């Protein structure tokens, strides 16, 4: 699922995401949420909703019962950094044996480029007000 269907697409409503998560819960499905465009919502009446946050707000039964993989990347235009190759995925409630195989699969791939991973670090942990680079960020 993509809460924002590609860069020119529509933004999914919270209700739509709740319906997807409810369906995944009922059918025991893994949800893969492509959230790389979360910072590219420009209309005032549209808002990005994280699948994980919506899942949490649905209560412990859902939050602890839905397998969710959430993706984010530096390659999709946070501040014009397209071309950097860096990203991460967060795994929630995945069967430990499946997660072990996923880690194994990811471990045998080539290492990502350092500049992209450095950019990803800044996106997930931006400079704080008291830090020298805050004004430039």
Which ranges hold each PLM region?
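Active-site pre-lysine segment of PLP-dependent enzymes
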Residues: 5-30, 37-84, 96
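Conserved core segment of the aminotransferase class I/II
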Residues: 53-137
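PLP-dependent aspartate aminotransferase-fold enzymes
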Residues: 1-3
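A general marker of short, structured functional hotspots
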Residues: 19, 33, 130-133
């Amino acid at each position: 699922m993509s809460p924002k269907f590609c860069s020119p697409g529509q933004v999914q409503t919270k209700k739509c995401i709740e319906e997807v998560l409810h369906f995944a819960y009922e059918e025991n499905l893994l949800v893969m949420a492509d959230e790389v465009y979360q910072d590219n919502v420009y209309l005032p009446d549209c808002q990005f909703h994280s699948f994980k946050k919506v899942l949490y707000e649905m209560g412990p039964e859902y939050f602890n019962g839905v397998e969710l993989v959430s993706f984010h990347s530096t390659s999709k235009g946070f501040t014009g950094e397209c071309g950097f190759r860096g990203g991460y995925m967060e795994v929630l409630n995945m069967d430990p044996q499946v997660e072990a195989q996923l880690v194994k699969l990811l471990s045998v791939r080539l290492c990502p480029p350092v500049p992209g991973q450095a950019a990803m670090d800044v996106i997930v942990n931006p400079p704080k007000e008291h830090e020298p680079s805050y004004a430039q960020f």
